[in-house]
Structures are given as C-alpha cells and as structure tokens.
C-alpha cells in the first residue's frame, strides 16, 4: 500500500507546477485555464488521499463537486476565449483590459 505521504507530495508537486505555470504564462489565457485546472486536480488529489487515510467518504464526495465546478469553469472559460478571439482576433491577456460600454 502506498503511504499517504506520497500522495500529498504528488499534490504539492502538481500545485507547485500549476502555480509556476500561472506566474510564467501571463499572456496566454488558455494556458492560464489549464494551470488553474491542474491546481484543482492537485487539491482533489489531497482530498482523496486524506479521505482514504481517514476512511471518510466526505472527501471523495467533495471531489465530485469540485470536478463538476471545474468542468463548468472550463466550458465557460473556453466559450469566453472563443468569443474574444472571434471579436478581437487574439487571446492575449494584456490586450483584454479595454471594456466596451
């Protein structure tokens, strides 16, 4: 059986990679969305590890809610990105600071 420490280290590594990805890729909004999804995956990994370690089902149920919210976030985020690309011709985050009235 794999100890819970290994799962927590995996969660920390995934969270750290996503945090570095968010810091380094400030221009591309699609990469920002992917990094946020990776961050949610890291949190889910920790919830599953603690849920299995303490023999509680609550953490696993909470993961399903997080996955549902993450899927909705990804769908809405990609729809907004497609509309921005269609209207403006690029998906550069720096050029999205102008709002139309």
From Swiss-Prot:
CC terms in the record's Gene Ontology section: NADH dehydrogenase complex; plasma membrane
One GO term (biological process): ATP synthesis coupled electron transport
Keyword Cell inner membrane in record: yes
Membrane topology: Multi-pass membrane protein
InterPro entries named among the record's database cross-references: NADH_UbQ_OxRdtase_chain4L/K, NUOK/Mnh_C1-like
Location, primary (coarse class): membrane
EC numbers on record: 7.1.1.-
GO molecular function terms attached to this record: NADH:ubiquinone reductase (non-electrogenic) activity; quinone binding
Compartment(s) of residence: Cell inner membrane
Record-annotated membrane-spanning stretches: 4-24, 29-49, 61-81
Record's keyword terms, sorted: Cell inner membrane, Cell membrane, Membrane, NAD, Quinone, Translocase, Transmembrane, Transmembrane helix, Transport, Ubiquinone
Organism superkingdom: Bacteria
Reaction(s) this enzyme catalyzes, per UniProt: a quinone + NADH + 5 H(+)(in) = a quinol + NAD(+) + 4 H(+)(out)
Family of this protein: Belongs to the complex I subunit 4L family.
Function according to Swiss-Prot or TrEMBL: NDH-1 shuttles electrons from NADH, via FMN and iron-sulfur (Fe-S) centers, to quinones in the respiratory chain. The immediate electron acceptor for the enzyme in this species is believed to be ubiquinone. Couples the redox reaction to proton translocation (for every two electrons transferred, four hydrogen ions are translocated across the cytoplasmic membrane), and thus conserves the redox energy in a proton gradient.
Cross-referenced NCBIfam families: PRK05715.1-2 (NF004320), PRK05715.1-3 (NF004321), PRK05715.1-5 (NF004323)
Subunit note: NDH-1 is composed of 14 different subunits. Subunits NuoA, H, J, K, L, M, N constitute the membrane sector of the complex.
Name the record gives this protein: NADH-quinone oxidoreductase subunit K
Species of the source: Legionella pneumophila subsp. pneumophila (strain Philadelphia 1 / ATCC 33152 / DSM 7513)
